[in-house]
């Protein structure tokens, strides 16, 4: 029940005085012709009176009917002062009654004065702020990466080893590089550290050829390292040495 009253009040408040006069005259014509064969439609008559619709047949009929009633002519000739005063009183009462409802609706944002574009505009504004923050964050990340790279470049290699757990490619260096540098500089400390750290798997070191290993592994050393054992030596060589003595 609240919405129809609000709509009626809004229509009456937004209606100009000329439209009110047209509506009153057309309503009077409709009342006079309601029992006739062709009653006048007050809505069409009022629109034709305001020159909104063409042709103005209903309005012409209404003017012809009003010409037969002196009261209507007198009201029209006097510019409808009394009717305007009455209409103003009605409009004032309606405005007073409708003002609280309109204020409540404005507070709760139910009126069409707040379209959905405001919502989309807010979403677009949020997206724009997000994109701006991302655009500002990208240079910061890039600058942070550059600073980290500069610190890593200026940092001591041993500190980098402690920091990254020894999984760098440039430090510690490979065994071949360390061996070449040790031969040129005469410093084998780095190679020894690597040998102790990785358990001798950086370079191939042949085991010492001992007879204990020969006894232990059998003929493996003879085949692998071409070791000549006493069993393979010529026994005549020992006999010749004995005769010479």
UniProtKB/Swiss-Prot annotation:
Question: Where does the UniProt entry say this protein principally localizes?
Answer: secreted
Q: Name one GO cellular component term.
A: plasma membrane
Which is an annotated Pfam family here?
Answer: Opiods_neuropep
Where does this one sit in the cell?
Answer: Secreted
A single Gene Ontology biological process assigned to it is: neuropeptide signaling pathway
Entry comment on modification after translation? The N-terminal domain contains 6 conserved cysteines thought to be involved in disulfide bonding and/or processing.
Propeptide cleavage-removed residue intervals: 21-161, 175-195
Q: In its keyword annotation, does this UniProt entry include Thylakoid?
A: no
Signal sequence coordinates: 1-20
Query: Mind listing the GO molecular function terms for this protein?
Result: opioid peptide activity; opioid receptor binding
Q: Which UniProt keywords apply?
A: Cleavage on pair of basic residues, Disulfide bond, Endorphin, Neuropeptide, Neurotransmitter, Opioid peptide, Secreted, Signal
- The reply to whether Transferase figures as a keyword in the UniProt entry is no
Protein family: Belongs to the opioid neuropeptide precursor family.
| Functional description taken from the UniProt entry | Leu-enkephalins compete with and mimic the effects of opiate drugs. They play a role in a number of physiologic functions, including pain perception and responses to stress. Dynorphin peptides differentially regulate the kappa opioid receptor. Dynorphin A(1-13) has a typical opioid activity, it is 700 times more potent than Leu-enkephalin.
Protein name in UniProt: Proenkephalin-B
Species of origin reads Cavia porcellus (Guinea pig)
């Amino acid at each position: 029940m609240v919405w129809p009253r609000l709509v009626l009040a809004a229509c009456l408040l937004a209606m100009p005085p000329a439209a009110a006069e047209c509506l009153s005259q057309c309503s009077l014509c409709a009342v006079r012709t309601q029992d006739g064969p062709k009653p006048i439609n007050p809505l069409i008559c009022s629109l034709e009176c305001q020159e909104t619709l063409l042709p103005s047949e209903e309005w012409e009929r209404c003017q012809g009917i009003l010409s037969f009633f002196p009261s209507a002519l007198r009201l029209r000739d006097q510019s409808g002062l009394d009717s305007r005063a009455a209409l103003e009183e009605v409009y004032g009462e309606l405005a007073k009654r409708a003002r609280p409802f309109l204020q409540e609706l404005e507070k709760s944002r139910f009126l069409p004065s707040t379209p959905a574009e405001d919502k989309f505009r807010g979403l677009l504004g949020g997206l724009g702020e997000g994109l701006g923050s991302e655009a500002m964050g990208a240079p910061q990340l890039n600058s942070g990466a550059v600073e980290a790279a500069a610190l890593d470049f200026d940092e001591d290699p041993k500190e980098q080893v402690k920091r990254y757990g020894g999984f760098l490619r440039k430090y510690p260096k490979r065994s071949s590089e360390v061996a070449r540098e040790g031969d040129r500089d005469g410093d084998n400390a780095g190679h020894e550290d690597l040998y102790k750290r990785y358990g001798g798997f950086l370079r191939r070191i042949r085991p010492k050829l001992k007879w204990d290993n020969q006894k232990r592994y059998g003929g493996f050393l003879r085949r692998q390292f071409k070791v000549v054992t006493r069993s393979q030596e010529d026994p005549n060589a020992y006999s010749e040495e004995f005769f010479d003595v």
